[in-house]
């Protein structure tokens, strides 16, 4: 995790622990620079990250203010860190269906920008929230980047392992959303009937150097999944 990201996390934790509400004012820029012993540019990047996440808003000449917290149980479509943190107040578990090393499908190779002869980790799992099915997930990880996975890792947060275990820096993602109907396989794993509605998300996650490392296809249980996009000047 880069320094500005670490500071952003600490500021966000401070907001949560002190139960700050929308409109509460945070320390001024100079105070934050002194507190964290970093340059103005680093603090500015931290605040920009928090603003993009919807945690704060800045008013020129007035200061830095807390923004209204998003509702509990909603998954942010703007997060690059996986959705485990969005659901930290809930019991999120995973059931691993498949985990192996194989060659990519043409679709995975294209989205990961790799050759058909390169190895990938293929992961198929079902995610649960408080014991109820949340989503059915198929993921392809470039093995030359994500060098090791096992059942224990895949049963928990893969992104936490990628950041903390492998020391990789996750940069940005591209998400493609579709509304459709569950096929037989998806319905079976989600405990629903085929033909019921689903939100289907294809995601491509990249490192900070722009290299894609994860291509995932996720079908969400419409009864259990809720999403949020907190728009700001970066999106409008």
Swiss-Prot record:
The keyword Protein transport does not apply. It holds the Pfam family UTRA. Keywords: DNA-binding, Transcription, Transcription regulation. Residues 29-48 bind DNA. PROSITE patterns: HTH_GNTR. Residues 1-69 form the HTH gntR-type domain. Gene3D superfamilies: Chorismate lyase-like (3.40.1410.10), Winged helix-like DNA-binding domain superfamily/Winged helix DNA-binding domain (1.10.10.10). InterPro entries: Bact_HTH_transcr_reg, Chorismate_lyase_/UTRA_dom_sf, Tscrpt_reg_HTH_GntR, UTRA, WH-like_DNA-bd_sf, WH_DNA-bd_sf. GO terms for molecular function: DNA binding; DNA-binding transcription factor activity. One of its GO terms (biological process) is negative regulation of DNA-templated transcription. PANTHER family: HTH GNTR-TYPE DOMAIN-CONTAINING PROTEIN (PTHR44846:SF4), MANNOSYL-D-GLYCERATE TRANSPORT/METABOLISM SYSTEM REPRESSOR MNGR-RELATED (PTHR44846). This is Uncharacterized HTH-type transcriptional regulator YydK. It comes from Bacillus subtilis (strain 168).
């Amino acid at each position: 995790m880069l320094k500005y990201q670490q500071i952003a996390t600490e500021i966000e934790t401070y907001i949560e622990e002190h139960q700050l509400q929308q409109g509460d004012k945070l320390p001024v820029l100079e105070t934050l620079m002194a507190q964290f012993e970093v340059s103005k540019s680093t603090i500015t990047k931290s605040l920009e990250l928090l603003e993009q996440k919807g945690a704060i808003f800045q008013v020129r000449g007035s200061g830095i203010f807390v923004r209204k917290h998003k509702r509990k149980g909603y998954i942010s479509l703007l997060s690059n860190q996986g959705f485990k943190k969005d659901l930290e107040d809930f019991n999120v578990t995973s059931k691993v269906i498949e985990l192996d090393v194989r060659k990519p499908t043409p679709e995975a190779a294209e989205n990961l920008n790799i050759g058909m002869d390169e190895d990938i980790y293929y992961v198929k799992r079902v995610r649960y929230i408080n014991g109820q099915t949340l989503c059915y997930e198929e993921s392809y990880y470039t093995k030359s980047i994500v060098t090791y996975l096992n059942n224990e890792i895949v049963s928990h947060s893969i992104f936490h392992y990628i950041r903390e275990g492998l020391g990789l820096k996750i940069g940005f993602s591209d998400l493609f959303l579709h509304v459709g109907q569950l096929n037989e396989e998806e319905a079976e794993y989600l405990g629903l009937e085929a033909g019921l509605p689903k939100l289907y998300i294809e995601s491509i996650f990249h490192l900070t150097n722009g290299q894609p490392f994860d291509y995932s296809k996720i079908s969400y249980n419409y009864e259990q999944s809720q999403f949020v996009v907190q728009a700001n000047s970066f999106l409008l």
